[in-house]
C-alpha cells in the first residue's frame, strides 16, 4: 500500500492518552490491531481513530472507522442525540473491564454503533464504530476485545 504520513500503520499495540476537552480527565488507552490493513490518524484531538483500509493514501471522512473519544460527561456524549436517526439500544458490552451501554443510529449520513461508559479514572469513553464489522470473531470484535486501560 501507498505510504501516508498522516495515517501511519496501527499494526500491533497502540497506546494513546485520551483527553476530555475542557476538563482534567485523561485515560491511557491500549488497543491492539492486526498486523496488516489498519491505520491510525497521526493527529489527535484527544482521541484515537483507527481505519481499516488497503490504501492509507485515500482515507476520507465517510470511510469505515473505530473512534475512541473521552468526554467529560454523558451530556457531552449525547450532545448531538437529537440529530440521531433510528436510534436503537443495544445489549451492554464489557470493554476493557468496563460495562458500556450500546446503541446504533444514523448521523450525518453514516450508520454508527456506539458503546459508552463512565471510566473508573473519570470521564466517559465513547467508542464509535462505522462501517466495521464487530460481530464475534471479526477483526473489529478482536480489536474491541483487545482494549485495556493503563
Predicted regions and their residues:
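Residue-level detection of beta-strand scaffold positions
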Residues: 14, 69-73, 98-100, 113
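Short beta-strand element of the conserved SAM-dependent methyltransferase core
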Residues: 50, 68-70, 103-107, 115-117, ...
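Second-shell loop/turn segments in exported
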Residues: 65-67, 90, 128-134
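Signature of long, low-cysteine stretches enriched in small and polar/charged residues
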Residues: 78-124
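A short, sequence-level motif marking secondary-structure junctions
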Residues: 32-36, 64-75, 117-120
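Extracytoplasmic/secreted envelope proteins and their assembly/folding machinery
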Residues: 74-77, 81, 140-144
Amino acid at each position: 500500500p501507498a505510504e501516508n504520513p498522516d495515517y501511519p500503520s496501527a499494526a500491533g499495540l497502540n497506546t494513546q492518552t485520551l483527553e476530555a476537552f475542557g476538563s482534567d480527565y485523561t485515560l491511557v488507552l491500549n488497543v491492539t490491531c492486526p498486523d496488516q490493513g489498519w491505520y491510525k490518524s497521526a493527529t489527535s484531538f484527544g482521541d484515537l481513530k483507527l481505519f481499516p483500509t488497503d490504501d492509507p493514501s485515500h482515507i476520507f471522512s465517510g470511510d469505515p472507522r473505530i473512534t475512541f473519544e473521552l468526554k467529560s460527561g454523558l451530556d457531552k456524549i449525547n450532545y448531538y442525540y437529537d440529530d440521531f436517526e433510528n436510534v436503537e439500544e443495544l445489549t451492554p458490552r464489557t470493554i476493557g473491564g468496563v460495562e458500556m451501554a450500546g446503541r446504533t443510529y444514523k448521523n450525518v449520513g453514516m450508520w454508527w454503533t456506539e458503546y459508552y461508559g463512565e471510566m473508573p479514572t473519570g470521564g466517559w469513553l465513547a467508542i464509535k464504530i462505522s462501517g466495521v464489522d464487530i460481530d464475534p470473531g471479526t477483526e473489529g470484535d478482536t480489536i474491541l476485545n483487545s482494549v485495556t486501560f493503563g
